Structure formats: C-alpha cells, structure tokens
C-alpha cells in the first residue's frame, strides 16, 4: 500500500540491549527517518530485527550504489537518498541472540512452564531441517528434569535444565546441567557439563568436567567482552580428554585434541587453541 522500496521488521527492545542492535526512528506514517547501527547512546528503543523486504528494483539499485552491509551502509544510504523505507512493527516472539549470554538465555527460556515461544503450538509449526532418527531413549539409570531431549538422543545419566539436540549421548553417571549440547555430541560416563555450550560432535571424556568452580566472574582473557558470565564454550568436534577439568568462561577451539591441553586443569578464563601440527593453550 505504501509502495515501499524496503520494509524493515522492527520491535521494541530494552534500552540496555539497544547498543548492540540497529536502532531506528519512524514517523506517524511508519516511514523510517533515521537508522543507526549499534549506537553508543540510543535515541530510541525501536530495533531492527534484521528482516528486510525489498522491491527488486530498489535492491538492485542500492546494492550497486552502496557497500554491501545492510545495517551499516545500505539502509542508512537509502534513507539519506530519499528512498521509501518503512518499518513494520512485529508483536510476536523474537529474541536477539547476538551474544553468548543472550543465546543461552533464549534456550533456557524454552524450559519454562509457559515459554513465550510455544514449541507445541499446532497453529505455529516450526519448519526446520530434521533428519529421520530413532525416538529419544531415556535409560533405566537416567534422571531427567526440566529439559528438552531431541530425537535420536540416548540418556543414561542425569540431565537437568538443559537442551539436547538430536543424537546427543549422555553416559551412565554423567551429568549435564544448565547447558546446551548440539548435534551428535557424546558425554562419556562420569563426565560433568555445567553451564556450557557444546557445538556439534563434541566428545567429553570419562570423568572430565566442563564448567568447574563457583567463580563466574573471571572473564575470558582473549575475549573478555564476549565470555564473562560463567558460560564455557566448546567448539565443533573438539575432544575433551579423560579426567580434564575445565573452569568457567573458558573457550575450547574446534577440533581440539588431547595433545592441545598443556595440563589436566584449564583454569577459569583460559582458551585452548588448535593449530595444524600441534596445539597450544593460552591460560
């Protein structure tokens, strides 16, 4: 109806989050009058959701005349150039997961009795790629509390307040608590994963601990602005050796192997790096 060159999906956010988003102002007709990417001092709480609907003609023109970053270049250039840029206020579920903490919180929110995003609403189905796997199995020795267990999982240990993607295995005596574990990761018998995010195909060896200690406030020394709330992250296909103890706010690189660990203890705030030929750790 408004013959927009581009329409942005927008919604209100807490001002405390606005500094890490694209913030905009709109007039009474819904036309966008200002757009600032990650402002230090936000003038508005209206944020872009990162969803843009362009007319084909406008998209071709502005991509050829502007740099390719939509939030940083294309949208601001269109507004300055007089293009018809409008905002659509979205009132449904949406979460920005641009930080490790917000990603973890969005997953933990799914475990609430009445989550804002209802995964079981038949009127709003979630369409996503999903392999055909066997149903999830809860073994005789398992204990599961307030968790999401996907298809293909085998749980023989304890899972508390956690989200398990398809194909995750939790061995006898293992504990997964307050964590997100992605596809086909294996938690061996007796291992503990606490307040952690494990990428795909990670193996945690028998008796190993990922997320040890009560001091959540020691930030990661390489990336203190990103990893500072007690969450430990483990990269894709990393292997945590038997008995290794890993503290809080630790980053384990993808494909790390036993030879990359300088000792059996990785202190809070450290990073374990993987390099071709040999690995090294930055404590």
Language model regions located:
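Conserved core of the sugar-phosphate nucleotidyltransferase
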Residues: 1-56, 65-66
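Left-handed beta-helix
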Residues: 57-58, 64-283
């Amino acid at each position: 109806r408004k013959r927009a060159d581009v329409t942005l999906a927008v919604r209100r956010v807490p001002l405390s989050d606005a500094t890490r988003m694209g913030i905009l102002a709109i007039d009474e007709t819904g036309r966008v009058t200002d757009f600032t990417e990650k402002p230090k001092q936000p003038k508005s709480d209206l944020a872009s959701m990162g969803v843009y609907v362009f007319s084909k003609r406008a998209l071709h023109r502005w991509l050829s005349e502007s740099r390719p970053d939509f939030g940083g270049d294309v949208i601001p250039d269109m507004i300055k150039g007089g293009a018809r840029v409008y905002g659509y206020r979205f009132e449904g579920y949406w979460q920005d997961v641009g930080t490790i903490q917000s990603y973890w919180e969005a997953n933990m929110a799914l475990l609430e009795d009445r989550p804002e995003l209802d995964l079981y609403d038949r009127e709003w189905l979630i369409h996503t790629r999903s392999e055909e796997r066997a149903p999830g199995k809860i073994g005789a020795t398992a204990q599961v509390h307030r968790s999401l267990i996907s298809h293909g999982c085998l749980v023989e240990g304890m899972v508390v307040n956690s989200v398990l993607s398809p194909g995750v295995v939790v061995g006898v005596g293992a504990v997964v608590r307050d964590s997100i574990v992605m596809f086909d990761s294996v938690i061996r018998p007796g291992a503990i994963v606490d307040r952690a995010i494990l990428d795909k195909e990670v193996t945690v060896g028998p008796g190993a601990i990922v997320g040890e200690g009560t001091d959540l406030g020691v930030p990661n020394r390489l990336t203190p602005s990103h990893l500072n709330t007690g969450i430990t992250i483990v990269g894709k296909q990393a292997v945590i050796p038997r008995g290794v103890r890993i503290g809080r706010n630790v980053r384990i690189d993808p494909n790390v192997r036993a030879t990359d660990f300088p000792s059996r203890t990785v202190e809070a705030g450290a990073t374990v790096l993987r390099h071709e030929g040999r690995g090294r750790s930055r404590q």
